[in-house]
């Protein structure tokens, strides 16, 4: 999320930038005094973020200074008496906002990884002000006219393909954000955007509070029967951190909850932990998000109508690969039926195990992971507890580096402690170099969960690659929520955690391999349903023999993972895919239908329940993200009507992985070169469909996706997705 400051008394209106700028310059006249956030980044590698010197009181003044600087730059562009050209308009617009970009980088890290009450107060103050600031730029009619003139004028024919793409992108983005609306509509749109910014912040903060402040406490070690020793120690440490030494705590985060649900023998405690987790944001307390969701949906529907779209979903997907909600839904429905059929088989297998044990139960949602693990042990002689000692975080991280070097010639060299500032002692930094030793960028890694850090895993782009005014190195980070081990012990991952590790590293490589001139087109700044292609594709290298045999070594003996265990892992590759697919699609289809519903008031709980009933959601599975804590779609606009993107990208991923198979294996240099050239390095300089065709030689097919997940052939013909 972005957070910026505009004096709340200012009314945003078309052509009102000068008034806003004047007010902001007054409020921020002392913003740069001894403030590390407003100074150019110092240090090696073209400068690095000043994480070590920032305090919460620096944030608001720095944001004000950044906005004032960008608004002044925009006003100069808009008021330029010279005819609009690429250099004096498009390139100048690219250069505007560099100070604000630097401030927002650090601010985003603070609010996402080190949040506390003081920062949350700043977030609440800043959210609507940033929205107003953004609208002030969008609604500058002279700026839009100049950008459109370059995009549509005679000069466009003489621009490079990347320059034409950039001019098109800025003109399109401004138009989609309301630049063509009349004065009254612009005023209403600005008010909507400011309220939405506040609501998005409220939603995310409520989820963070629920995750940080709630846990299930266990008073007897017998309550952890079946739970691996590493998870027990983590639970004991979590209890100590919460003032309950001698007890055990299961925090309300996925990294703690899922291992408990997988291994804990006590069914009543599994249910208790499960309910804590799935009811985040839905408890009727101060952090309940249902009312927030209702209002967000209403405002999004109204905004879409103002912008000339039938629904929010139609607006969001216009610039995606899918293009329309109908195409996205067609893909989801093509996968839904075989996935549900597979779930029926999985549940039957689990019920048979429970019956054989004399459990006297009917499989419920809090039983799924537990009995699925039993089925996997019985069918494939494979279980998480056997795998975990081989999945050491540090060694698998080295395995990722091995993949990056072998495929793309990138080498990762650790920097010493204190060589560049970091925001927490857990964070480490690596210099990334090409085959010739030249620095490509920096990779920051923040692996462990902690209080004040939002849940999940993500890649952050501290600074995009560019060469508009000289070569600028990208600075990227991967952020995870793995359970931190006790001092002196290795961090051991589940297979899912290891997959997440490789997934996020795929995003990092997308940023590090970027090779474009303009920052707005760099790295991961691509369509939402395309950006997951590099990340999901890199997951495949985790299970290659070359990675497992070298880097999956036992934490005590140091011996590599046995070949027969690797064979069992590969045989179990499609295991439990019904569950994984249905829990995802439940969330993705509810997301899409919420945003196709139009302007009618929505009760989130009722809508979710009725939608899942209509779909035929198996009762043994709950959505991966229930509506009241669905940060992807309600903490900002990011994945709203776009959670399907992971499936769309996985269709591309399965098809792209096939290119390596057709060429003889995962290390084929020619295929890797095409992947880097046409996908990773190209950023948004070309249309993603064209970029994929250049890499693959054709359009993708859904059949590879269904084969990957172990499902039947496509239910719908490929033409339904065209």
Located regions from the model:
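Short His/Asp/Glu-rich catalytic/ion-coordination signatures at enzyme active sites or charged loops
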Residues: 43-58, 107-126, 149-191, 251-291, ...
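Intrinsically disordered or highly flexible coil/loop and linker segments, enriched in small
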Residues: 68, 72, 76-83, 99-116, ...
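C-terminal, non-catalytic "cap/extension" segments appended to globular domains
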Residues: 32-53, 58, 65, 247-249, ...
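Active-site-proximal, well-structured secondary-structure segments within enzyme catalytic domains
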Residues: 162, 166-168, 198, 205, ...
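Bacterial N-terminal signal peptides
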Residues: 15-27
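N-terminal helix-rich structural modules
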Residues: 4, 32-233, 722
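N-terminal secretory signal peptides that target proteins for export/translocation
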Residues: 1-12
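Short pre-active-site segment immediately N-terminal to the catalytic Zn-binding motif
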Residues: 483-501
